[in-house]
Curated annotation (Swiss-Prot):
PROSITE patterns reported for this sequence: RADICAL_SAM
Subunit structure and binding partners: Homodimer.
UniProt remark on cofactor binding: Binds 1 [4Fe-4S] cluster. The cluster is coordinated with 3 cysteines and an exchangeable S-adenosyl-L-methionine.
Binding locations of Mg(2+): 50
Transmembrane segments: none
A Pfam family of this chain: Radical_SAM
The name this protein goes by in its record: 7-carboxy-7-deazaguanine synthase
CDD domains associated with the record: Radical_SAM
GO biological process: queuosine biosynthetic process
UniProt-annotated binding residues for [4Fe-4S] cluster: 41, 45, 48
Entry keyword annotation includes Nucleotide-binding: no
Family from the record: Belongs to the radical SAM superfamily. 7-carboxy-7-deazaguanine synthase family.
Function, in words: Catalyzes the complex heterocyclic radical-mediated conversion of 6-carboxy-5,6,7,8-tetrahydropterin (CPH4) to 7-carboxy-7-deazaguanine (CDG), a step common to the biosynthetic pathways of all 7-deazapurine-containing compounds.
Amino acid sequence: MLMEKYHDFEPNFNIVEIFESLQGEGFNTGMPSVFVRFGKCNLDCPWCDTPYNNFKRWSVSQILEKVRSFSSKNIIITGGEPTIVPKIEYLLEQFKSDGYFLAIETNGLKAIPAQIDYIATSPKSLYAHKYEKRCIPFANEVRIVMDSNMPSFCELIEQKIKAKNYYLSPCEIDGKMNLLETITLLGQLNQRSNKPKWQLSLQTHKLIGIE
């Protein structure tokens, strides 16, 4: 249906980069994957280290050619924020036709395309008011970057987004990683009764110097 809809007009996409590497964080750490990074985002987090506004227009054919040049059959759709990309379902259908396993990295505020096999969401505490109103109800994993107002935000996300795995990740503030604060909060969260257990997720790709 989607292929027929766009038969006479193949959409182009804002692509920051496409590369093959190892997943560096979360449940699938170490998994060889092809990363397709889309431009633009619907949030503006002050600590974001992703150049999501530095993109070029790629055709579907160009994207497929690049992705097929790598050996991995796992694709991570990331950004920016991929759920705001117009006509992304068309591209995802092409990936599925090629037999790829599709994971998405999203902030969790917009609906997830049906073609996605695995959802990793990273809710942002700066926008807690948005998650109180509406967000995705389920993810395979939740990864939250440790910044401020975290205990109450973690509890909010537990209520809003059901997940198999919940992770906290430290972030760099004024040139220093807040690892101590992160593991301290992990201990507090995991002392609660009948609540989800949280785990530590590090950006291991940065620690070992890969993309």
